[in-house]
Every structure is written in C-alpha cells, then in structure tokens.
C-alpha cells in the first residue's frame, strides 16, 4: 500500500474566546496544517498539527517545508507500516517532531482503515470507556474565571485547568485558584498552570498560599529542577507538560519526584507512534496522563481520543476536546462532550471525514 500523493491545507482556527497564558502567550487565531496521504490502494489518511506560537519548539510555518523535505522518504513508502516509515523519516531529518506528528497520525489512519478497525482497536485497546475531560480556563479576572468554572461544573465537568501568570500578579493567581476551588466545591480536580512562566520563588509563594486547598500545580517553571523545588517547597502534587517530550524526559521527571501527572501531547512527542511508547512508560511508572495535543481541530482531537481510549482507564487523568474551543469544525459528525466526558469516534481509522469545502484550496501537493 504505497503512498502516491500528499496534499496539504492550511486552516486558521479561531478561538471562541481569546486564550491568555503566562509570559505573554495567547491563542486567538492559530494556523493549523492539515495533511492527507493517498495510497495506491485507494485508502487515504488524515493528519493535523497546530503549533501554538511561542509555546514549544514548533512553528506552523515550518510544517510544510519539513514535509516537503521528507517527500523522498514518504513517496512510495508502505503506509501500512507507520513505525517503519517514521523511523526512516527520523533518519532522514532529525527533530521537527511537530511536523512529523501530522505524518504519523495520517499513517495510523491509513493502517487502521486498511485493517477495518477504529484506531483505538488497531492500537490494541478497547476499554469501552468514556474519557474524562478537563475544561481549560483562560487567564482573565479571577471572578470571571470562577464564573466560567461554575458554569462548566453545572454542565457536568469535574476537572478544571486554571491558567495563571498572564498578568504577573501573585495575588491575582492566588485568587484565581481560591475562587475556582470555591466555585466548583469539593471533589473536582483543580490545577493551576503557569506554562513555564513563573520563577520558582513566585510559584512557591502562590503554592504555599493555597496549600490548605485541594490544588495541583502544573509546569510552573522552565526546568524540571525548578519545578522540583516548587513541588518540594509547597508539598502540592504537580503535573509536567513542556518538560516532558520523550521517554528520557519522562524518566527524568519521574526520578526527580515531580511528575504526579504528565501531559502527553501528540505533536510534542511526534505522533501516535511515539505517544504510545510514552503512554506505556507512564503506565509502567504508575503516572496518570492527560492525553491530548497542543491545539487543533477535529483530526488531532480524534487522534488523541483514540490513544486515550486504548489506555487503561485508571491511568487516564483526562483528555481535551480541542475542537470545541475553536472554529471552524472540520467534521460535524464526531462525538462531542457530554456531562464531562467524551468518547473516541467509532468509525474505521480516525473516524474523521473533513469537510473539503472548509479546507479550501490546498497550499501544497506532492505527487
């Protein structure tokens, strides 16, 4: 089943609400690159990657050139063997995992379609689970964040990510965590995320001020060592995100006793092939996971949901329905959140059929 063509589109995803994070990071209009692999068997596979500006070592303008550079490896390759193809890509071009993620997702879509299975079954798991969602709250005024949390709690959400640090105001961050915790009551998971934007001192001060509450912290600082110092000083559980991007960094976080939970993002690791290895390591270590991607629409959301659905339920902390935060929807037939949960699509492969009218004209085609 050889790859015969690669088509690329660019879609501007508009956030329903401007998304503010620490250190000047925002999500408003973000460029997503959509990829389709066609094969001589008449089976096509879809991929997507949507890098957030200034967030990770990735940028949207680099996706198409990287994929075009990999064309000699991809054209004619057997798409039914995703990991073999990705190993060849890694040998030909080091790094650029974000661009490779879209390729790997599409390869898994093709291979699981050929097998006649939803991707989660192709990956070896059918736990029949509803996947718990979290709702991410943009870093705005504390009382507004509490209002959003209460509204989402009323809809059934039980996990809340509270963005911190956008205004570099410790007192405001303390209020954000305290008011959201109060708004959702006892039981739901509440965690404050600085996206690497805090110093260890500021994160420690905020953490100690809310240490009497049921709160988890997420990636306050830029390094594992700094995060570990905050974890030790506050005695609050911590989730790592930006610092974990392969099996070696996951082991480093675990050995530093700072990784109570980990964010496994498709484009951060390089696609489904790499993410399932990271997932299996976390299961072996007993670490709960958030299985998602940085940003995106229905294709990347579906890929992450399939990985989540093939993961033992006790290790799935949560997933994210990224496509609910942005417009346009590329496929209106896919599952949506319901009382705090979502399921993976049940069709073969990713189960995604993007609306070509919404994609518009391709920006590149490789024959």
Q: What are these regions, as identified by a protein language model?
A:
Residues 1-44, 50-54, 323-328:
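Structured beta-strand/loop patches that form or line metal/cofactor-binding pockets in enzymes
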Residues 124-234:
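Metal-dependent enolase-superfamily TIM-barrel catalytic cores that perform enediolate-based chemistry
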Residues 327-367:
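C-terminal extensions of enzymes
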Residues 65, 222-237, 245-341:
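Shared catalytic-loop signature of beta/alpha-barrel
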Residues 45-47, 129-137, 158-162, 190-194, ...:
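Hydrophobic faces of well-ordered beta-strands that scaffold small-molecule active sites
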Residues 5, 38-114:
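Metal- or metallocofactor-binding catalytic centers and their adjacent structured scaffolds
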Residues 3, 35, 42, 70, ...:
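Conserved, mostly hydrophobic/aromatic
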Residues 98-99, 104-138:
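Glycine-rich, aromatic-flanked loop segments that form ligand/cofactor-binding clefts
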């Amino acid at each position: 089943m050889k790859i015969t063509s690669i088509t690329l589109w660019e879609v501007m995803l508009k956030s329903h609400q401007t998304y503010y994070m620490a250190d000047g990071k925002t999500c408003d209009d973000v460029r997503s690159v959509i990829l389709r692999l066609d094969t001589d068997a008449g089976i096509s596979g879809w991929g997507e990657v949507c890098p957030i500006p200034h967030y990770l070592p990735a940028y949207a303008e680099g996706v198409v050139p990287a994929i075009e550079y990999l064309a000699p490896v991809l054209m004619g390759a057997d798409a039914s063997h995703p990991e073999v193809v990705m190993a060849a890509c890694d040998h030909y071009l080091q790094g650029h995992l974000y661009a490779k993620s879209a390729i790997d997702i599409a390869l898994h879509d093709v291979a699981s379609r050929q097998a006649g299975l939803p991707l989660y079954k192709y990956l070896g798991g059918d736990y029949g689970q509803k996947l718990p969602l979290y709702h991410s709250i943009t870093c705005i005024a504390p009382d507004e964040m509490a209002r959003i949390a209460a509204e989402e709690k009323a809809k059934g959400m039980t996990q809340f990510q509270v963005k911190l640090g956008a205004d570099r105001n410790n007192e405001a961050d303390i209020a954000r965590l305290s008011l959201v915790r109060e708004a959702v009551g006892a039981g739901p998971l509440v965690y404050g995320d600085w996206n690497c934007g805090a110093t260890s001192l500021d994160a420690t001060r905020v953490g100690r001020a809310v240490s009497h509450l049921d709160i988890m912290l997420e990636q306050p600082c830029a390094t594992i060592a700094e995060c570990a110092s905050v974890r030790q000083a506050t005695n609050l559980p911590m989730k790592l995100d930006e610092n974990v991007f392969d099996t070696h960094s996951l082991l480093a976080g675990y050995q530093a006793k700072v990784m109570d939970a980990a964010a496994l993002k498709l484009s951060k690791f390089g696609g489904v092939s790499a993410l399932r290895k990271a997932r299996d390591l976390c299961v072996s270590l007993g670490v709960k996971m958030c299985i998602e991607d940085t940003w995106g629409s229905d294709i990347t959301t579906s890929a992450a949901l399939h990985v989540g659905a093939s993961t033992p339920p006790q290790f799935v902390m949560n997933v994210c329905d990224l496509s609910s935060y942005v417009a346009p929807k590329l496929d209106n037939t896919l599952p949506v959140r319901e009382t705090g949960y979502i399921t993976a699509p049940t069709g073969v492969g990713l189960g995604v059929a993007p609306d070509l009218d919404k994609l518009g004209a391709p920006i590149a085609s490789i024959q």
